[in-house]
């Protein structure tokens, strides 16, 4: 006999508790442009003083990295990942993130877990100037197993039309600057999980130190590049930018330039972190496929004039980033050449 909605597997009271736990963190991200309080049907955001604004949108999720989070019972870092995957994409066009919305789905809602996830989303928003203006938490018993969660996000950014970066200014002879990743970011985890399923924890700790677990390394959040890259854009003209996600350098770097151009990357210049070398050793996957699956230590790239390379690298270094030149642009068929 079903006597209440709760008997079907949906606990509204747990949902109310989750909202209360989230509120404080969410409100930390709000600014004077946010015109609505939590609970409104739609979020309102005032654009302010822009002459000819262009809105840039992006949406993404975290993928199977969530399974590691669920096994480790650590959920905050994947909230940061969710934001990073979206804001880094809109950043590629020169846009400053304005606001963010999240979507959380689960089999059985645990208010504490939901709050932990959203605390990570909040942290990601604070790192990227984005206001967390809304979201949806969907408890879906029978669709998801108890203990399973999925999270996705949606971001809107803004840029003046004359400052829009669309790749049309990229030309032969431009140089490619790499900005280091923090690890796997949020891509390639189906392979990562397969490779490390039976991996010897002691060997792993020897590589990274006694106080670092495999979970710590695999759950390192995706780096958010918004603040340092916007600083670069204040001082320099950047012709193209690429967020290196699924498909690695092979799929993502060509996206920021015209079809008649090809990026050339010198693999001996790419500073590949040890974790990727461990993947190579454990899987025996060919080098080219690794570069076409993972970021291989390069999380973001800028295509710039040769005269600006040194000073841009100096600026990024002063902002705490690891940046270095990895290649250039040639006439070609739009495919990446790894030399």
UniProtKB/Swiss-Prot annotation:
It is an enzyme of class 6 (ligase). GO terms for molecular function: ATP binding; phosphoribosylamine-glycine ligase activity; phosphoribosylformylglycinamidine cyclo-ligase activity. Its main location: cytoplasm. One of its GO terms (cellular component) is cytosol. Pathway: Purine metabolism; IMP biosynthesis via de novo pathway; 5-amino-1-(5-phospho-D-ribosyl)imidazole from N(2)-formyl-N(1)-(5-phospho-D-ribosyl)glycinamide: step 2/2. The lineage of its organism: Bacteria, Fusobacteriati, Fusobacteriota, Fusobacteriia, Fusobacteriales. Keywords: ATP-binding, Cytoplasm, Ligase, Nucleotide-binding, Purine biosynthesis. It is found in: Cytoplasm. Coiled coil: none annotated. This is Phosphoribosylformylglycinamidine cyclo-ligase. It comes from the Bacteria. Its EC number is 6.3.3.1. It catalyses: 2-formamido-N(1)-(5-O-phospho-beta-D-ribosyl)acetamidine + ATP = 5-amino-1-(5-phospho-beta-D-ribosyl)imidazole + ADP + phosphate + H(+). The gene is purM. SUPFAM superfamilies: PurM C-terminal domain-like, PurM N-terminal domain-like. One of its GO terms (biological process) is adenine biosynthetic process. InterPro entries: PurM-like_C_dom (IPR010918), PurM-like_C_sf (IPR036676), PurM-like_N (IPR016188), PurM-like_N_sf (IPR036921), PurM_cligase (IPR004733). Belongs to the AIR synthase family.
């Amino acid at each position: 006999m079903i006597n209440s909605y709760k008997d079907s597997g949906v606990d509204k009271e747990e949902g109310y508790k989750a909202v209360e736990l989230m509120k404080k963190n969410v409100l930390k991200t709000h600014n004077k442009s946010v015109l609505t309080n939590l609970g409104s049907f739609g979020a309102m955001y005032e654009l302010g003083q822009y002459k000819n604004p262009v809105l840039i949108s992006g949406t993404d999720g975290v993928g199977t990295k969530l399974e590691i989070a669920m096994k480790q019972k650590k959920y905050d870092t994947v909230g940061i990942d969710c934001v990073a995957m979206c804001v880094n994409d809109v950043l590629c066009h020169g846009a400053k993130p304005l606001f963010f919305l999240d979507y959380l789905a689960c089999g059985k809602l645990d208010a504490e877990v939901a709050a932990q996830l959203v605390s990570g989303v909040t942290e990601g928003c604070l790192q990227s100037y984005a206001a967390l203006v809304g979201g949806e938490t969907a408890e879906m018993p029978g669709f998801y197993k108890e203990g399973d969660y999925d999270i996705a996000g949606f971001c809107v950014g803004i840029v003046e039309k004359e400052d829009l970066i669309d790749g049309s200014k990229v030309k032969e002879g431009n140089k490619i600057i790499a900005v280091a990743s923090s690890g796997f970011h949020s891509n390639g985890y189906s392979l990562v999980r397969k490779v490390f399923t039976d991996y010897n924890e002691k060997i792993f700790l020897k590589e990274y130190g006694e106080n670092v677990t495999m979970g710590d390394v695999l759950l390192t959040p995706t780096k958010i590049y918004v603040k340092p890259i916007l600083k670069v854009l204040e001082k320099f003209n950047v012709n193209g930018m690429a967020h290196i996600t699924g498909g690695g350098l092979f799929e993502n770097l060509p996206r920021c330039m015209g079809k008649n151009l090809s990026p050339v990357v010198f693999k001996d210049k790419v500073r590949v972190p040890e974790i990727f070398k461990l993947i190579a050793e454990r899987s025996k996957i060919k080098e080219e496929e690794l570069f076409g699956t993972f970021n291989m230590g390069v999380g973001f790239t800028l295509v710039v004039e040769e005269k600006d390379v040194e000073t841009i690298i100096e600026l990024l270094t002063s902002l705490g980033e690891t940046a270095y030149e990895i290649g250039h642009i040639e006439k070609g068929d739009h495919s990446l050449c790894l030399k």
